[in-house]
Design a protein with these regions (language model features):
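Extreme N-terminal "head/tail" segments of very large remodeling/mechanoenzyme assemblies
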Residues: 1-131, 141-143
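Extended, Lys/Glu-rich alpha-helical coiled-coil stalks
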Residues: 31, 49, 118, 124, ...
């Protein structure tokens, strides 16, 4: 996945920020630096929030809204990215509680594909967006954080995770599901052959019992 553009409005410490990732992403290596609390980790939270409506640390997404945001301003993340030659955009608006209101102002989400400047909406409902994002990227939110983000302090957690969890993450990373399916088919075929062989063996034994060789 190649990030193209990230726009943040009332998100964490960012009142309104636009980052053109395509201007630096082709560099062999780049570094995001800044003082503690300046918003470095918030950028990765923005990726995860936009795609999965989650945070990298599992904290409440309501905490992503800028503390000093005016009630009339919505918290919005717009994330453009490229994958397998296709340009996608996901725009997500955070639900929030206005001062004096008892009910939340609802959030919104829209996933679209952009081709030659033409926007095609792929999904606008939360469950549909979740399913489509996982289909496009090939990872759920937990796998995305482990493989793409790997938040601070989580590397040790990944190393200490059980074998099955590691296996699933590495399968997703190296896209080896096809080979696993092939292995499963071979194993099932081998079991079928073995069952047929044993069946024929029993049938032959039964037939030989009918003969008297004395």
């Amino acid at each position: 996945m190649k990030p193209i553009r990230l726009e943040l409005r009332e998100f964490g410490p960012y009142k309104h920020e636009v980052i053109q990732w395509n201007e630096i992403i082709n560099e062999p290596m780049f570094l995001i630096t800044g003082k503690t609390g300046s918003g470095k980790s918030t950028l990765f939270d923005a990726f995860v929030y936009a795609l999965y409506n989650k945070t990298t640390s599992g904290k409440d997404i309501a905490s992503l809204r800028t503390k000093t945001a005016d009630d009339k301003n919505r918290t919005i993340v717009i994330f453009d990215f490229e994958l397998q030659g296709k340009h996608y955009r996901i725009e997500r608006t955070l639900a929030y509680l206005k001062t004096g209101n008892k009910n939340l102002t609802s959030g919104k989400v829209c996933l679209m594909e952009i081709n030659a400047g033409i926007e095609t909406i792929l999904a606008t409902k939360e469950n549909d967006v979740k399913e489509k994002v996982e289909q496009i990227i090939g990872l759920d939110d937990k796998q995305f954080c482990q493989i793409i983000i790997l938040p601070q302090g989580k590397f040790k957690e990944f190393l200490l995770s059980n074998s099955n969890e590691k296996k699933e993450v590495l399968r997703s990373l190296f896209n080896t599901h096809f080979y696993q399916k092939f292995v499963d088919k071979l194993q099932n075929f081998a079991k079928t052959l073995d069952s047929n062989y044993k069946l024929k063996e029993r049938e032959l034994a039964t037939k030989f019992e009918k003969f008297d060789f004395e």
